[in-house]
Regions:
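Short, basic/glycine-rich phosphate-binding loops at helix/coil junctions
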Residues: 3, 66-69, 136-140
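Substrate-gripping "pore-loop 1 plus following alpha2 helix"
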Residues: 15-20, 145
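Conserved acidic, metal-coordinating active-site core of Asp-based
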Residues: 90, 97-170
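Short, contiguous strand/loop micro-motifs
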Residues: 11-12, 74-75, 144
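Short, surface-exposed acidic/glycine-rich loop or hinge patches that mediate macromolecular interfaces
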Residues: 15, 40, 150-152
Length: 170
């Protein structure tokens, strides 16, 4: 059994599972049904949400690019390095009002020094991340790149990112 997490099992962008869901997941497990929590979040953040049943369920993290169960990565779907490089360069060119994270199997890489954004990643999403000078210089498998803008990224997505990358990356 698979379920989305944010907005379904927990309020959006919070770290706590609705208490009644823990019991429901335990009931599924007792019946031999494997529960999989699916989210765009990173694995560490999802595991914190399900901390009471963390070793009993499967995780589908990073928008499906990271599947994890019982201490093992079952599937990792990496971005093509050339696409990742071009996307990062494009996001850098947008200026400091846009933040981005580069997701790896071990957490996120961030170039930003923006304290508000870093605090949101650490205390809001409870992400594991490393601040680096250049995300592209790191020897990591890139699973996902996410962009953040305090207001909205809708216009950027619709007018810039989707026309350029929509058919190439998901």
């Amino acid at each position: 059994f698979r379920s989305d997490i944010d907005g379904t099992l927990i309020p959006d962008s919070t770290p706590d599972l609705y208490p009644e869901m823990v019991e429901e997941i335990k009931k599924l497990t007792d019946r031999g049904i494997l529960f999989c929590g699916a989210s765009g979040r990173q694995l560490a953040s999802i595991r914190r949400v399900f901390r009471e049943v963390e070793d009993q369920i499967c995780y589908i993290a990073e928008n499906g690019t990271h599947v994890y169960y019982k201490g093992k990565d079952l599937a990792l779907t990496a971005m093509k390095p050339e696409y990742a490089r071009q996307i990062v360069e494009q996001l850098r060119s947008l200026g400091s009002e846009y933040e981005f994270t580069v997701s790896t199997p071990h957490g996120s890489l961030l170039e930003t020094k923006n304290r508000l954004f870093l605090d949101m990643m650490k205390y809001g999403y409870h992400n594991i991340f490393r601040q680096v000078e250049d995300v592209l210089a790191e020897e990591e498998v890139i699973l996902k790149i996410a962009v953040y803008h305090r207001g909205s990224i809708r216009q950027l997505g619709e007018e810039v990112l989707i026309p350029r990358w929509g058919g190439l990356v998901k």
